[in-house]
């Protein structure tokens, strides 16, 4: 597995917010995704970390392993990620605020912290996989696997910790509700998720240009996108019927009921079919022919067959090494078919699905009694 894919897979369950949820004041559900310029914290005049030391930024929206639906945080990756990891990178508070919580993630042998900084009543910065805390924060550090609420004032640009390898960052803006989640009630387990826009738009132009130049994604929004739902269409994320939405039925494997027909986070014209339960595993595939576009599949379309295939990223004519910076990548599917998945939108928000392992679209013509229903 490539380094960047190992990186995604290593980020444990809970998504960008991770751990315990953090409220963010009043929620405005007007679907306006433009930052509120009247907010005196904006634009941010400091980056989230020392950008001069990173190799690249993995944008929002990746899908890998048990991250079945698009990931709600970015990854800021050092050049030596996965090697000796001797490069230490400072993490900053991009604007003045208060550290409202610190969590020890407890997933690894070394210290691994999640930090939430409230910049206003509605805007937060969230970091995961911070290796060490700044002196101001370290007296409040929880023990392994624990979580503490705090109220620690930090200045704009103040160092709050450091990391080696990679850190997760996302921004939450509770004044914004992303329009590509057609049923926000399915995300109550991670309430920040529907309020997680592209962070790049929140920084001053000088910093924003540096962020844009470091992202592996060349298409707008360059910082990534996690909301792909269209009402009455296949595209976007789904949850197995009666499985409690994003939360699932078991917090230890909440992703089992997840399903997504979305777009790749780096090359967004490439369709990704992402499964929380693919013969007991969590798997992602391209679809043979990269068609039909799930945005074009509606109730009137009827039965659709997707042949599931592996895929590769290309930097020019060469497969991307998954560890060095580049932009303008393309993707290509392999020809070997792992399975065929049948899908049919039986109602605008109800989807019928069945996977036929080891078979192709030529082998299968109809659902069996093993078909499963998913809802938004």
Report residues per predicted region:
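Surface-exposed, glycine-biased beta-strand/turn segments
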Residues: 24-113, 133, 155-156, 196-200, ...
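Zn2+-dependent peptidoglycan hydrolase active-site motif and core
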Residues: 94-146, 167
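C-terminal motif of bacterial Sec signal peptides marking the signal peptidase cleavage site
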Residues: 8-10
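Sec-dependent signal peptide recognition
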Residues: 1-4
């Amino acid at each position: 597995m490539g380094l960047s894919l190992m990186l995604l897979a290593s980020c444990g369950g809970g998504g960008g917010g991770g751990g315990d949820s953090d409220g963010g004041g009043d929620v405005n559900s007007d679907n306006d995704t433009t930052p509120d310029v009247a907010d005196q914290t904006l634009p941010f005049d400091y980056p989230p970390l020392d950008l001069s030391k990173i190799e690249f930024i993995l944008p929002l929206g990746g899908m890998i392993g048990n991250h079945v639906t698009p990931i709600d945080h970015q990854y800021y990756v050092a050049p030596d990620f996965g090697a000796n990891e001797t490069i230490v990178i400072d993490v900053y508070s991009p604007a003045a605020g208060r550290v409202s919580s610190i969590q020890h993630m407890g997933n690894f042998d070394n210290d691994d912290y999640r930090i939430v900084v409230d910049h206003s009543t509605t805007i937060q910065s969230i970091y995961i996989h911070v290796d060490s805390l700044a002196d101001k924060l370290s007296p409040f550090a929880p023990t392994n696997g624990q979580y503490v609420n705090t109220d620690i004032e930090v200045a704009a640009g103040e160092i709050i910790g450091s990391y080696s390898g990679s850190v997760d960052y996302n921004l939450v803006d509770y004044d914004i509700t992303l329009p590509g989640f057609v049923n926000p009630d399915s995300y109550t387990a991670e309430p920040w998720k529907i309020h997680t826009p592209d962070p790049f738009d929140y920084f001053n132009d000088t910093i924003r240009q540096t962020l844009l130049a470091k992202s592996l994604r060349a298409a707008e929004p360059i910082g990534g996108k996690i909301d792909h739902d269209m009402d009455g269409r296949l595209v976007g994320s789904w949850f197995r019927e009666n499985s409690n939405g994003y939360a699932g039925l078991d917090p230890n494997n909440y992703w089992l009921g997840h399903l997504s027909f979305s777009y790749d986070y780096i090359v967004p014209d490439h369709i990704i079919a992402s499964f929380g339960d693919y013969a007991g595993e969590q798997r992602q595939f391209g679809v043979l022919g990269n068609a039909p576009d799930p945005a074009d599949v509606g109730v009137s379309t009827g039965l659709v067959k997707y042949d599931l295939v592996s895929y590769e990223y290309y930097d020019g004519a060469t497969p991307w090494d998954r560890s060095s910076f580049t932009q303008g990548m393309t993707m290509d599917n392999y020809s070997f078919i792992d399975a065929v998945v049948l899908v049919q939108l039986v109602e605008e928000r109800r989807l019928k699905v069945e996977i036929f392992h080891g078979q192709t679209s030529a082998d299968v013509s109809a659902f069996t009694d093993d078909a499963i229903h998913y809802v938004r």
